[in-house]
């Protein structure tokens, strides 16, 4: 049974939409409809407010930590159509970059595997996905996939950095031949897989269909050394699917229904070992699921989140924006 280890009083003045631990598990970033992003030191069960970041002009939907090899960097996205990248310098958090290239609410941000460099994917209600790549000297290159999801994009998630056709490291001194991929979920009820071509452009590689309503979240499972790719998806239709691909070409994906919930499912998140999936929904619970030896997914724990639906107002905001 899972127990609550710590409770953090964020002092946000409105609904909290996301909370993310950093790479080392010592800092917690939160964001809220009060337009703020907060960072706490949560070591040893404590909670010390490190930063209260103000820069957005609307509800902040999501935050994402970059890998620490690039420093202490946090991205946030908002209903105000902006993505802000924050960086800690000499103990002080400041805005280092602002991306205002979308025409509607930006709903999701996700950093690419650190092997690729500092790259951020951003999904928006305008249907586009933008990719921000740090090129040095404070400069960011922007590429945009227009009409990625015709009615709006709700979620983005990168595939792990794996060299195609190989389960071992590249020879010493040889640069790995990574193929960059990520998944997106949208209001067209679809999950789409994207791949970077040799010319640097992004191409739709696959379209996964199983949901009957808006896809709310997608999560590409971490690589554990097996020649299998796995993606979890959840939807307004209350269903969670586990998609697997054992095909070397990456084209043959098979969905398995994990569970049909009685309410919308907002978020899915994998454990670092990819054997446990956390599911958060409108039923005010977080459930943990594990695949049994016979291939069936079993609920191993559920935690009641308390009174109120944690993500209810996200729907209202995104629907109004559209």
Curated annotation (Swiss-Prot):
Q: Which residues carry this modification: Phosphoserine?
A: 184, 309
Instruction: Describe regulators of its activity.
Output: The GATOR2 complex is negatively regulated by the upstream amino acid sensors CASTOR1 and SESN2, which sequester the GATOR2 complex in absence of amino acids. In the presence of abundant amino acids, GATOR2 is released from CASTOR1 and SESN2 and activated.
GO-annotated cellular components: COPII vesicle coat; endoplasmic reticulum; endoplasmic reticulum membrane; GATOR2 complex; kinetochore; lysosomal membrane; nuclear envelope; nuclear pore
GO terms, biological process: cellular response to nutrient levels; COPII-coated vesicle cargo loading; endoplasmic reticulum to Golgi vesicle-mediated transport; mRNA transport; nucleocytoplasmic transport; positive regulation of TORC1 signaling; protein exit from endoplasmic reticulum; protein localization to plasma membrane
Q: What is this protein called?
A: Protein SEC13 homolog
Top-rank taxon of the source lineage equals Eukaryota
Q: Which GO terms describe its molecular function?
A: identical protein binding; structural molecule activity
Q: How does it assemble?
A: At the nuclear pore: component of the Y-shaped Nup107-160 subcomplex of the nuclear pore complex (NPC). The Nup107-160 subcomplex includes NUP160, NUP133, NUP107, NUP98, NUP85, NUP43, NUP37, SEH1 and SEC13. At the COPII coat complex: interacts with SEC31A and SEC31B. Interacts with SEC16A. Interacts with SEC16B. Component of the GATOR2 subcomplex, composed of MIOS, SEC13, SEH1L, WDR24 and WDR59. The GATOR2 complex interacts with CASTOR1 and CASTOR2; the interaction is negatively regulated by arginine.
Matching entries from Pfam families are given as: WD40
User: PANTHER family per the record?
Assistant: NUCLEAR PORE COMPLEX PROTEIN SEC13 / SEH1 FAMILY MEMBER (PTHR11024), PROTEIN SEC13 HOMOLOG (PTHR11024:SF2)
Q: Which gene encodes it?
A: Sec13
- Per the record, residues carrying N-acetylvaline are 2
* Similarity comment: Belongs to the WD repeat SEC13 family.
Repeat positions for WD: 11-50, 55-96, 101-144, 148-204, 210-253, 260-299
Q: What is the annotated role of this protein in its UniProt record?
A: Functions as a component of the nuclear pore complex (NPC) and the COPII coat. At the endoplasmic reticulum, SEC13 is involved in the biogenesis of COPII-coated vesicles. Required for the exit of adipsin (CFD/ADN), an adipocyte-secreted protein from the endoplasmic reticulum.
| Topology of this chain in the membrane | Peripheral membrane protein
Its predominant location is membrane
Q: Which UniProt keywords apply?
A: Acetylation, Cytoplasmic vesicle, Endoplasmic reticulum, ER-Golgi transport, Lysosome, Membrane, mRNA transport, Nuclear pore complex, Nucleus, Phosphoprotein, Protein transport, Repeat, Translocation, Transport, WD repeat
Q: Where in the cell is it found?
A: Cytoplasmic vesicle, COPII-coated vesicle membrane; Endoplasmic reticulum membrane; Nucleus, Nuclear pore complex; Lysosome membrane
């Amino acid at each position: 049974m899972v127990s609550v280890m710590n409770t953090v009083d964020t002092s946000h003045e409105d609904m909290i939409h996301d909370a993310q631990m950093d790479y080392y598990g010592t800092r917690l970033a939160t964001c809220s409809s009060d337009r703020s992003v907060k960072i706490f030191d949560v070591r040893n069960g404590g909670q010390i407010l490190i930063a209260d970041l103000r820069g957005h002009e609307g509800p902040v939907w999501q935050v994402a930590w970059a890998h620490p090899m690039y420093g202490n960097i946090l991205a946030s996205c908002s209903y105000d159509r902006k993505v802000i990248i924050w960086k800690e310098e000499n103990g002080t958090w400041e805005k280092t970059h602002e991306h205002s290239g979308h025409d509607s609410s930006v709903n999701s941000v996700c950093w690419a595997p650190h092997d690729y460099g500092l790259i951020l994917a951003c999904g928006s209600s305008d249907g586009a996905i933008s990719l921000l790549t740090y090129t040095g000297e404070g400069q960011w290159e922007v590429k945009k996939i227009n009409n990625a999801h015709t009615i709006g994009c709700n979620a983005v998630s990168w595939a792990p950095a794996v060299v195609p056709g190989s389960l071992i490291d590249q020879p010493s001194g040889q640069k790995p031949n990574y193929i960059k991929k990520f998944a997106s979920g949208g209001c067209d009820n679809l999950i789409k897989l994207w791949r970077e071509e040799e010319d640097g452009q992004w191409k739709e590689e696959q379209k996964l269909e199983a949901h009957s309503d808006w896809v709310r979240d997608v999560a590409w499972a971490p690589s554990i050394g097996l020649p299998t790719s796995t993606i979890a998806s959840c939807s307004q239709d209350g269903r969670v699917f586990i998609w697997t691909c054992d095909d070397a070409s990456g084209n043959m994906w098979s969905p398995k229904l994990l569970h049909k919930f009685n309410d919308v499912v907002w978020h899915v998140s994998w454990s670092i070992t990819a054997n446990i999936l956390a599911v958060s929904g409108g039923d005010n619970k977080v459930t943990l699921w594990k695949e049994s030896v016979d291939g069936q997914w079993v609920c191993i724990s559920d935690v009641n989140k308390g009174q109120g639906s944690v993500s209810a107002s996200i729907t209202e905001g995104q629907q109004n924006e559209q």
